[in-house]
């Protein structure tokens, strides 16, 4: 188990850095809710530069939750609005375009996470159809879904009936799509049966009291690492579903208060918008980075910097790890 004293922090002044993308250049990219919304670029020395939408206003901001990086320095933003969702592209010059705002003729609810499917398109998660989304913080709600957005063709719902769909990730083998269902406390997987096509849901494991699975990453051995909000936990999940707590920073009384509300189906924003801990600020995501992919970077909901620590194993490199981001670096004055 990681000692809290061994945690380092990088960056400062970030605004809701929920999701971290680590690039082989050493750059970290995180969502940023300042102004009209966009991302912040965090350099290896810790300095950060905001890259915000120039064609949106603070009255109509983008609120990125999950983000993905495209070749050429475009950043895809899963928009977590109060009522509306969608997927947007933020270009290096700060202009934006709508990638998707409806599926099957229906407007997208607030969206959670986006990731490449490995070549043919993107997967986008929607946690719940309920508005406000806090109505989905219940163990008996399963109206979340996953959209597949092909680079060529029409988007469609690839999986439905999920209990607060959060981060999804392709297994290193490419044969399975794993997904965290936060408020039914479950890590599930779907067999990839074709381009963007998924089989039936299978349960990898269920989590116990105090664990609310949010972030998801794989190491080179194919072991899953799950990040839990509220309890500030990182959980190692073996292939057989066996769980090991690797990191934890939580006040037992606070966790008991949240757990009681969850069990009574009375959980709401106050249970997520406050945290009682020593160092971590409601961690929500884990990204492997560093030159050897053995540094874990933790996204969070309530902090203004990124926590990091050394992992015992290297992470599986994601598709964005080596993409060309030269135009973005040049636009922000970071090109060497």
Q: Which residue ranges define each predicted feature?
A:
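Short, solvent-exposed loop/turn segments at conserved positions within beta-propeller repeat blades
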Residues: 33-35, 80-85, 131-143, 182-185, ...
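Beta-propeller blade signature
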Residues: 89-94, 141-151, 323-324
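Sequence/structural signature of beta-propeller modules
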Residues: 1-5, 308-336
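Short loop/turn segments immediately following beta-strands, especially the blade-tip
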Residues: 190-197, 239-244, 249-250, 310-320
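A short loop-to-beta-strand structural motif that recurs across blades of beta-propeller domains
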Residues: 38-40, 86-88, 144-147, 186-188, ...
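Beta-rich, blade/repeat-based domains predominating
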Residues: 11-27, 56-79, 104-130, 140-146, ...
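A short helix->beta-strand "capping" segment at the edge of beta-propeller domains
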Residues: 1-15, 51-53, 201-202, 268-272, ...
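Beta-propeller domains
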Residues: 28-54
């Amino acid at each position: 188990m990681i000692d809290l004293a061994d945690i380092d922090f990088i960056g400062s002044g970030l605004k809701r850095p929920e999701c971290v993308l680590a690039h082989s250049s050493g750059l970290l990219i995180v969502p940023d809710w300042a102004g009209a919304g966009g991302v912040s670029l965090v350099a290896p020395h810790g300095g950060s530069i905001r890259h915000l939408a120039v064609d949106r206003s603070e009255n109509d901001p983008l609120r990125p939750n999950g983000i993905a990086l495209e070749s050429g320095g475009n950043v895809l933003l899963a928009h977590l609005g109060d009522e509306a969702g969608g997927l947007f592209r933020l270009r290096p010059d700060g202009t934006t375009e709508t990638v998707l705002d409806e599926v099957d003729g229906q407007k997208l609810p607030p969206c959670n996470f986006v990731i490449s499917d490995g070549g043919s398109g993107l997967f986008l998660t929607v946690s719940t159809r309920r508005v406000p989304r806090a109505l989905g913080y219940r163990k008996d709600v399963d109206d979340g879904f996953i959209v597949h957005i092909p680079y060529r063709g029409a988007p469609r719902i690839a999986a439905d009936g999920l209990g607060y769909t959060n981060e999804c990730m392709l297994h290193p083998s490419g044969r399975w799509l794993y997904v965290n269902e936060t408020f039914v406390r479950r890590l599930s997987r779907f067999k990839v049966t074709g381009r963007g096509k998924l089989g039936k849901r299978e349960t990898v494991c269920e989590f116990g009291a105090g664990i609310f699975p949010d972030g998801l990453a794989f190491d080179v051995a194919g072991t899953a690492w799950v990040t839990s909000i509220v309890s500030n936990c990182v959980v190692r999940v073996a292939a057989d579903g066996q769980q090991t707590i690797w990191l934890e920073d939580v006040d037992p009384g606070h966790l008991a208060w949240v757990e009681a509300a969850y069990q009574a189906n009375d959980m709401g924003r106050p249970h997520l918008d406050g945290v009682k801990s020593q160092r971590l600020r409601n961690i929500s995501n884990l990204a492997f980075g560093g030159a050897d992919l053995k540094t874990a970077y933790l996204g969070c909901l309530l902090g203004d910097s990124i926590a990091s620590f050394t992992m015992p194993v290297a992470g599986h490199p994601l598709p964005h790890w080596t993409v060309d981001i030269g135009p973005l670096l040049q636009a922000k004055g970071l090109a060497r």
